[in-house]
Every structure is written in structure tokens, then in C-alpha cells.
Amino acid sequence: MTTVLSPGTFNPLHNGHADLVERAAKIFGRVVLGIATSPHKSPGDLTVRIDLAKEAIAHVKDVDVIGFNTLTVDFAREIDAEIILKGIRTFTDFEYEFQMLNMNRALKPGLETVFLAPSEEFSYISSTLVRQIAGYGGD
């Protein structure tokens, strides 16, 4: 069974993330939604983010939600992931993720990265926008 790691801070996990995981679960054997701590961001409490993610994707079969505080490649090794899955909304996303892809390959040869474009209905959603809207009381 192929294990795919979908890593991120998911602050918060939104409908676009959930859609990506649902689609990946149909393609691959096992999906691990890896929720990261980050020394470069100030994400919300890890336990809260994990609980919210578990609730949001509870209906999806063969998906595990696991928190981690290491390099993504080290976590991929730990869970025996063969593939990293990333959602790509824009060319800017691709440029950044392409750099990460090459660094991950250098650190863990054989680790592949697969990009999925978002479903059209979620193509504009980002965690930053969700936090901004929530900050003003929007839903």
C-alpha cells in the first residue's frame, strides 16, 4: 500500500485542504495528513489543529491525522511515506513547492512529490484568508 504524506501547518484546515485529502484517498492507498509545528510561523495550538482536522475528514477512509515537529523528510521516513502530496493553486505556490521538492529529494532520495490542483470551487481559499475573515466575525 502506498503511503502519501500531505504536510502543512493547516492553520486552519479548510475546505480546499479537505477536498485535496478526499481526492488523494481515492488515488493512493493511505494518506497521512501531517500537521506541522513551524519555527517560522505562529500557528495555533497543535492539539487543536489536529482535533479540528480529524473532525473535518473523519468521513474519509484510510486517512490518518498526525502531528509532527521535525523536517518533513524525517517525518516521511518515520511513517514510510513514498510520496509527498501538495496542493498547488498558483504559479507562486509551484515555484516554492518546486524548491522544496528538490531539497526533499536531496535529503531523502527516492521521495517523490505529487502536485494536485484544487477543485475550481476551492481554488481561491487559503488559510490566511480564512483567518482574516474569521477575525472580522465572518463565516
Task: State what each model feature region is.
Residues 1-139:
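Nucleotidyltransferase catalytic core that binds NTPs
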